[in-house]
């Protein structure tokens, strides 16, 4: 009788072992990529909350000490005099957003570029102003590259300085 060879593997056994190793490796690569994507999403969400909170502090300080107000044709406040971020002609400043999603006041950045990690974008919108109580209402929105909202807050700030109103325009 013939005895089986004990040493070594046959070609079929080698191919089966290689297929198992490849399947396990592919599963690990997929798992790691999903974990990295989930981690990046989580970090971006946390950074969005930090950015929103930081902008909330800066915007509330600016609105609290706002001077002369600027109204549009509909009577809505669109700008104000800011001592910290005056417009180029020292008139009323407005909250705007540049092409990269950085918040500007009077054409000047409120925060440095590295305050917007992971491609975060932000905007500030003045929703209203109550002349009797001198309370501003503003909305701060932080989005990702794709425009999905990651953080948003609405704040109400009482203006300390009694403003001298300016005409529309």
Regions found by a protein language model. Give the residues of each.
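Aliphatic-rich helix starts adjacent to a transmembrane/signal segment
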Residues: 2, 6-61
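Short beta-strand edge segments in extracellular beta-sheet folds
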Residues: 156-160
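Type IV pilin-like appendage domain
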Residues: 69-137, 146-149, 161-169
